[in-house]
């Protein structure tokens, strides 16, 4: 293992091995695990380390896909991806491959936590393929900045992004166009849509003395 104790800012050439929990992927470099987002198993990438607290692992994001996977597609939410809006961690992957990767994560968790040897099957719900992985989320958590802008956080930050749409949400939530509204003295807005089209709201107000 390298004597380097902090790799932040370093560019590493990596071959991605497998998926991990949370929509990130695993590579190894110089005896350490490197967790990388927005990649695919089998890809060769150039990635920059952005977090290293010492120990056996660090975290990086891709800056160049040297050898892309055949399962890579353009990000379905154009404002997501590296340094973009969080929440579309698999948006760059073909739907069939997404399901395989989710089954991989579940299989590993069952084995590790319960000792169960089982290969799960993740199947498409009716209409999923036609929707291209969009319009499925029945819950949204949006944040509000000091100017009243409503939107998701930028990946790995508490910066609210002004987005043009919320394409992962079901139509009952999208049509509210929360991202086009302005809220004062509000920290967070949570929305949930039922199967009958009803929408529940929860608004967290910003109280005096709250430093967020």
List where the protein language model places each region.
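Accessory RNA-recognition modules of RNA-modification enzymes
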Residues: 1-212
């Amino acid at each position: 293992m390298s004597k380097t104790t902090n790799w932040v800012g370093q560019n590493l050439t990596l071959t991605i091995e497998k998926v991990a929990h949370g929509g990130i992927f695993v590579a190894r470099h110089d005896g350490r695990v490197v967790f990388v987002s927005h990649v695919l198993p089998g890809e060769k990438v150039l990635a920059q380390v952005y977090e290293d607290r010492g120990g056996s692992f660090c975290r990086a994001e891709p800056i160049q896909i040297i050898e892309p996977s055949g399962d890579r597609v353009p990000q379905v939410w154009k404002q997501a991806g590296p340094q973009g809006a969080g929440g579309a961690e698999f948006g760059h992957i073909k739907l069939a491959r997404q399901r395989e990767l989710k089954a991989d994560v579940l299989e590993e968790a069952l084995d590790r936590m319960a000792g169960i040897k089982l290969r799960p099957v993740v199947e498409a719900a009716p209409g999923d393929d036609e929707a291209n992985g969009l319009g499925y989320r029945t819950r949204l958590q949006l944040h509000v900045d000091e100017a009243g802008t409503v939107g998701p956080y930028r990946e790995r930050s508490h910066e609210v992004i002004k987005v043009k749409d919320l394409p992962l949400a079901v139509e009952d939530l999208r049509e509210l166009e929360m991202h086009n509204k302005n809220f004062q003295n509000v920290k967070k807005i949570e929305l949930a849509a039922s199967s009958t089209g009803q929408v529940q709201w929860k608004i967290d107000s910003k109280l005096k003395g709250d430093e967020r």
